[in-house]
């Protein structure tokens, strides 16, 4: 992908920064996953860590899709693979990312669970 000035996408400092942030968020998700597994193995129950993970994972998947859309440009809209790109898989991944934000409880429900069980906030009315 190239910018309107003819530069490559990788020359876009903002895009590189965004990719770096995504890499850090993915590392944090991996650490959270290991913590959740350890807690479940120790206590025999998954706890609310799964809700925290689901929220973070849904958000990172959306951000990753946004960056991919910028890189793929118009090809991101096609279900057919174009020019050797597997953009059909990208489109399926984008749709799957949307379904993840609904599966196992909407993002708002997961936020309520975290607020009540982790942060000790009162139940939403």
Task: Set out the residue ranges of the language-model regions.
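Alpha-helical interface subdomain recognition
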Residues: 1-125
